Regions:
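Conserved, well-folded catalytic cores of nucleic-acid-processing
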Residues: 16, 30-33, 85-86, 113-114, ...
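Detector for small/aliphatic-rich hydrophobic stretches
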Residues: 2-5, 16-93, 113, 117-121
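Short gly/ser/thr-rich secondary-structure transition/capping motifs
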Residues: 73-79, 147-151, 217
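Residue-level signature of catalytic and energy-coupling elements of molecular machines
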Residues: 22, 82, 131, 171, ...
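Conserved inter-motif catalytic segment of the P-loop NTP-binding fold
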Residues: 90, 98-101, 108-197
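Conserved small/polar residues in nucleotide/adenosyl-binding loops
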Residues: 252-258
Length: 258
């Protein structure tokens, strides 16, 4: 039977507490705690020692291969630049920006110019017809971009397993939810848990994933601040509604270059 509990989460840094507090002990912000109800399914019983279920194996640095694996060329000079020379296989990239600034269009335009890569574009906000209309306005030379409209993380993994893509796009992380958490999509807990699960998937399969995320009125990524520390790279898409210019600003964690 699922266990249910109530926690309070800081909207600024993601710190949680069993009770509401006025000042966050982690980041020092005032009145940032909101209530979240979490229901987690019971995990499968494991041996007390854990030895029988261990899948990882310690190895020496000399036994590790793939250290010089080339980055994926995004066929966009500016995007390659802010990514440090291209997309790192197995990396998790967060692209943030104001709603309507052009995040989805930028990503769709980019993946449609990757003729040698199979891309799975997961849309949780727009229908397949809406994406088709957007794509028709973009000159492209790729027909190997698969579109699926889905918001369940478990179903997303099924689609990935069946299609085996070279690159996964999730638009947007605020629309995705996992069945193991009884909370609405976009909540602090859902965003954090889904992002952590996607990061684990990216590392285990060496599949790069680009998450699209919205920013709030304060100019930060919507969801817990800890989301920016889960991903390998944060790209923030900035601009002005009165001009056509768009400026990609990059913040890259050291983990992306390991």
């Amino acid at each position: 039977m699922a266990k249910e509990k109530t926690v309070y989460v800081c909207t600024n840094c993601g710190q949680d507490s069993p009770k509401w507090v006025g000042k966050c002990p982690s980041c020092g912000a005032w009145n940032t705690y909101v209530e979240e109800i979490i229901r987690k399914e019971p995990a499968n019983k494991r041996p007390v020692s854990g030895l029988e279920s261990v899948k990882s194996k310690p190895v020496t640095l000399n036994d590790i291969t793939g250290g010089d694996e080339p980055r994926i060329d995004m066929h966009d000079e500016e995007l390659n630049r802010v990514l440090g020379g291209g997309l790192v296989p197995g990396s998790l990239v967060l692209l943030g920006g104001e709603p309507g600034i052009g995040k989805s269009t930028l990503v769709l335009q980019t993946v449609l110019h990757l003729p040698d890569k199979k891309v799975l574009y997961i849309s949780g906000e727009e229908s397949a017809r809406q994406l088709k209309l957007r794509a028709d306005r973009i000159p492209h030379n790729s027909s190997d971009c698969l579109i699926v409209c889905e918001t369940s993380l478990e179903q997303i993994y099924v689609h990935i397993k069946n299609t085996r893509p070279d690159l996964v796009i999730i638009d947007s992380i605020q629309t995705i939810s996992t069945e193991t958490i009884d909370s609405s999509p976009g909540s602090l807990v859902q965003v954090r848990e889904c992002s952590a699960s996607i990061l684990k998937f990216a590392k285990e399969t060496n599949t790069p994933v680009i998450l699209i995320g919205h920013i709030n009125k304060e100019g930060s990524i919507a969801g817990p601040k800890v989301l920016e520390h889960i991903v390998d790279t944060v790209l923030q898409f900035e601009g002005d509604q009165h001009y056509m210019y768009r400026i990609p600003v990059s913040y890259t964690h050291l983990r992306a270059h390991e």
